[in-house]
Amino acid sequence: MSSGGLLLLLGLLTLWAELTPVSSKDRPKYCNLPPEPGPCHGRKFAFYYHPASNKCKEFVYGGCGGNDNNFKTKDKCQRACSG
């Protein structure tokens, strides 16, 4: 296979991996945790995965602590948890 063909194959595999949704079986366990604002008193908007609706939702994060179901952007939440 030529180097151009290998690059095309690599590009297609990368695209497939990015666009393939995470199945609930393969979803990280932290995606099922409830939103946890943490002990600090800041007011930062963050996103958490809501398994019942299969959507990422916004919540107010205190700025420290909490759990791993906490993402700076909706896009990062969806990539990690949406199936």
Swiss-Prot record:
From the record, give the cysteines joined by S-S bonds.
31-81, 40-64, 56-77
Grouped into one coarse class, the protein's main location is secreted
Question: Which tissues does the record link to its expression?
Answer: Expressed by the venom gland.
Which compartments does it reside in?
A: Secreted
**InterPro entries under this entry?**
Kunitz_BPTI, Kunitz_BPTI_sf, Prtase_inh_Kunz-CS, TFPI/VKTCI-like
What CDD domains is this protein classified in? Kunitz_textilinin-like
For this UniProt record, give its keywords in alphabetical order, as a comma-separated list.
Disulfide bond, Protease inhibitor, Secreted, Serine protease inhibitor, Signal, Toxin
Locate the coiled-coil region(s) and give their ranges: none
What SUPFAM superfamilies does the record tag this protein with?
A: BPTI-like (SSF57362)
Q: Which is an annotated GO molecular function term of this record? A: serine-type endopeptidase inhibitor activity
Domain BPTI/Kunitz inhibitor, first and last residues per copy? 31-81
* Pfam families for the chain: Kunitz_BPTI
Single GO cellular component annotation? extracellular space
Q: Which residues form the signal peptide?
A: 1-24
Q: Function, please?
A: Snake venom serine protease inhibitor.
Task: Quote the record's miscellaneous comment.
Answer: Negative results: does not inhibit vasopressin V2 receptor (V2R/AVPR2).
User: PANTHER family from the xrefs?
Assistant: BPTI_KUNITZ INHIBITOR DOMAIN-CONTAINING PROTEIN, KUNITZ-TYPE PROTEASE INHIBITOR-RELATED
Q: Which family does it belong to?
A: Belongs to the venom Kunitz-type family.
What is the recorded name of this protein?
Kunitz-type serine protease inhibitor isoform 5
Source organism per entry reads Bungarus flaviceps flaviceps (Red-headed krait)
